[in-house]
Amino acid sequence: SYDFTDKAHFDKYYADFIAGTIDPTYNYFRQYRFGVANVDVTGDPRWKAPFSAGQLGFYAQDKWNVTPSFQFTYGLRMEIPLFFKTPTANEPFNQYAAAHNWGVRTNHKLSSTPLWSPRVGFRWDINKDRKYILRGGLGVFTGRIPYVWISNNFVKTGLQMQTYSVNSPKGLDLILDPNGQEANAARLRAAGSQEVNVFEDNFKFAQTLKANLGFDFNLLGIDWTAEAIYSKTLNDIYYKNLSVDKTGQTFGQVTGYDWDNRPMYERTTTGTPYSYVYALYNTSKGYTLNLSLKAEKHFNFGLDLMASYTWTRSMSVNSGTSSVAGSNWMFNATYRDANDPELSLSAYNVPHRIQASAYYHTNYGARKQWETTVGLIYQGRSGSPYVIEVYGDMNGDGANGNDLMWIPTDAQIDKMKFASNVRVNNSKDIYPLITKVLGPGFNGTLTEDQQRSLMKQWVGDDSYMRDHRGEYFKRYADNLAFEHHFDVHLAQKYSFKVGGQLNSLELSFDIINLGNLLNKDWGHTYGDGFGRYFSPFNYEGNGVFKFDGTHVARNYDTYYSRWRGQLGLRYTF
């Protein structure tokens, strides 16, 4: 991978490349990394991990009619994970890990111990007329095993693959062919380093305990459903980077910013070939609670109405948002211990969701063979959860994207040091914050005081940060703007008999995101319900920050905010 320092460095490389004047002494790139198979071990430069696995599942269930109106269901599910290969033993690493009491080894094979999931449920027709039904259940759920996380440990034992990494490289060309990187790697003087992925010895697969209680009832001629679902983590995953450890100091002690007490780290594998050691561990922390209420009304003239509201709170230690071990660790933003992250809102926490629909059906014709359906669907929900982090390695753990922001007070901003020579071009007023604070058409170098003014205004303009000054921006503590989306469904169906069997032909047309069709400023999508990361300012090192005011965290997605039309044809026989 090639990491340019910033857009200015990319623009310079592009201009020099077009002109044929690449400067071998210029630092175009911030970092260059290249992974290659160790052919002395693999015998094949395009080696792939010999990973194979399977899963057996068995389920037994019985229903007991305690009374005609009360049913009790109980069952037992069993999953057996199967692993047909074992990761390669890296004996030098295993000895190093044992000497440091890490409790890990590269050739640890996960067991095929059965995973038991007992479940019970009930259904009670209270008045025996189906007007008031109480139902619920309790059980353990395993689900499908995320084999992609497991496969990392087969690929990265530290033997088959080597990684070359250099900061601020000089004399490297931008080679786009992934199979042609050897030319650049050959120019690097350092030996290839080893990233190692391992399990803790007693690693268990993820399981949750889930309970639900629902009440279906009819009131005022409307069918209602109230339901609560609670899921408690029994075993979930999180990652540790064993190649770093806390120094015993805090960021505040090192920089003089005494309000920020996040721990500082140092590398523990200096002088070894092990650049990163990511270990997969279990945690029992985490839960999800859903509360919902739904109302439905069906009219005998063909109109069906529905509306529902769901409130959600989802907490986790690590949301497991990546398929790669290193990313799951380094992008799990934290303000505390990166190897023991705090329980916080998850990347999937969408607290409010509203749904409503109105469908009208009408049949006509001599034999009622024609049916027309018109539907209007509304979906409203909280935007994607997000975090605000500082780009740069504030705590020395080697990761540039996992340090949650401290939300400073104005007095603390006055004490912060800011970088010099920060250029900003807002001559066309494309950055609202800069226009608001520095006036229209600003184009020049920001002073420290101007950066302080921009940061004060930015914090003050954000509703969440304004109310949480003097705190860390907790992981996924806020959500992007609430979204409103309307869809339209139109369908025309014709029914007929063929050989005594009823057949039908249906033509349908759906308008998805109707609001955006009517007005380009309506129907905006601010995310996909999945956690987002924003890094509006940088940490330059030695207690110095850079804030240029150009970041717009709450911008909408221009692609998914567009309206779409969908034409369908269905034949049923």
Model-identified regions with their sequence ranges:
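Signature of Gram-negative outer-membrane beta-barrel scaffolds
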Residues: 1-129, 165, 321-327
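Gram-negative outer-membrane beta-barrel transporters
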Residues: 225-369, 373-384
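Transmembrane beta-barrel strands of outer-membrane/channel proteins
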Residues: 1, 58, 74-80, 136-140, ...
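Extracytoplasmic gating/loop element in the C-terminal half of outer-membrane beta-barrel translocons
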Residues: 373-499, 535-557
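Short loop/turn motifs that connect adjacent beta-strands in outer-membrane beta-barrel proteins
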Residues: 69, 126-132, 220-221, 302, ...
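C-terminal beta-signal and terminal closure region of outer-membrane beta-barrel proteins
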Residues: 519-573
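Solvent-exposed loop/turn elements at secondary-structure boundaries
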Residues: 87-117, 122-281, 481
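Residues on the lipid-exposed face of transmembrane beta-strands in outer-membrane beta-barrel proteins
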Residues: 58-64, 76, 120-124, 213-217, ...
